Design a protein with these regions (language model features):
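N-terminal first-folded block
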Residues: 1-42
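C-terminal structural segments of small proteins and small subunits
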Residues: 60-94
């Protein structure tokens, strides 16, 4: 049975949302360019794929952007496809 996604942590100094699952670090990285979060990379170990971990990381990043009034540049292909699957997030796109 898939493990529940642990709490997502935001490390502002690293420009990263992350969690650890089964001892493996899972991340959603970004850069700031003014008030735009450039979402550059989402990484989940192949053994953990299909559990909703990447989606949880991206959802946390987009919630942070919305709360702080940032726009999002989805440079990562996973973030782009997530936003397309969740049209309520498209208003964040820069």
């Amino acid at each position: 049975m898939p493990t529940a996604v642990p709490e997502i942590q935001h490390h502002t100094a690293l420009h990263r949302f992350q969690c650890t699952v089964e001892g493996r670090l899972c991340v959603a990285d970004y850069r700031m360019a003014g008030n735009v979060m450039q979402m550059t990379h989402t990484g989940v170990h192949p053994s953990l794929e299909g559990r909703g971990i990447a989606a949880a990381l991206v959802a946390a990043a987009l919630a942070h952007a919305r709360t702080h009034g940032f726009k999002v540049d989805p440079q990562c292909s996973y973030v782009r496809s997530y936003m397309q699957r969740h049209p309520e997030t498209l208003s964040l796109q820069s």
